[in-house]
């Protein structure tokens, strides 16, 4: 049986240096600001690319896939080629169409794939550091925050890229202690657009 813990790879969709204490607080404050902004959104539609790189024969072997995320309040639906994830706020479902298999669990911040809940997961248990800026493809400034877990056997570092103008997630990169690199990059991000409530119903799958 596949486990919901595997889905935390989504858990997602990364922040000039001051003294250590100052950069820690500045980076965490930015994450909190993005969290509050995301929480206030009525709806979200994100098209993303997920790329996983694993060490292979002295190099990195990568595979990429496309997906979409729809969110309305606490309700979330994620569609990919391999699976669908659905949360109605009380229960979470992991659906594998090819296997005609559905897994069910209680919905909480640990299983949710909503952008707000993913960001909330990083409010404690990590050290934070501002990690430079880049210019995105559309000319926007992307501020990065590096997070290191206080205690983790699986995650070495997480890099979160934030569009400083829109305060929306732009890219999420997770570096595993086993050398695996997982990247979720946002291809398009629409907010407060009309969404059909029925799409968050398990019976619509």
Language-model regions, residue ranges each:
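Bacterial N-terminal signal peptides that target proteins for export
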Residues: 1-10
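Sec-dependent N-terminal signal peptides
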Residues: 9-18
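N-terminal leader/targeting segments and the immediate start of mature chains
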Residues: 19-61, 70-75, 204-205
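Short, exposed beta-strand/loop patches in secreted or surface proteins that constitute
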Residues: 37, 66-70, 84-85, 129-136
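A short, surface-exposed beta-strand/turn
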Residues: 65-66, 71-72, 86-88, 158-171
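An acidic-aromatic
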Residues: 66-113, 182
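Flexible, surface-exposed loop/linker segments and immediately adjacent secondary-structure boundaries
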Residues: 107-139
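Gly/Pro-enriched, hydrophobic low-complexity segments
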Residues: 126-133, 137-204
């Amino acid at each position: 049986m596949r486990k919901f813990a595997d889905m935390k790879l989504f858990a997602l969709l990364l922040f000039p240096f001051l003294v250590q204490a100052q950069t820690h607080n500045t980076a965490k404050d930015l994450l909190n600001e993005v969290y509050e902004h995301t929480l206030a959104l009525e709806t979200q539609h994100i098209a993303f690319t997920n790329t996983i790189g694993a060490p292979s024969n002295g190099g990195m072997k990568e595979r990429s896939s496309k997906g979409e995320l729809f969110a309305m309040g606490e309700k979330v639906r994620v569609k990919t080629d391999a699976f669908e994830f659905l949360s109605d706020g009380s229960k979470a479902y992991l659906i594998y169409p090819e296997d005609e298999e559905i897994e069910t669990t209680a919905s909480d911040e640990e299983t949710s794939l909503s952008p707000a809940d993913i960001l909330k997961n990083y409010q404690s248990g990590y050290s934070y550091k501002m990690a430079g800026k880049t210019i995105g493809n559309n000319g926007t400034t992307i501020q990065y925050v590096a997070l290191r877990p206080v205690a983790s056997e699986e995650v070495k570092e997480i890099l979160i890229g934030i569009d400083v103008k829109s305060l929306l997630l732009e890219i999420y990169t997770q570096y595993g202690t086993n050398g695996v690199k997982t990247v979720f990059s946002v291809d398009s991000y629409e907010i407060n657009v009309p969404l059909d409530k029925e799409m968050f119903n398990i019976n619509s799958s």
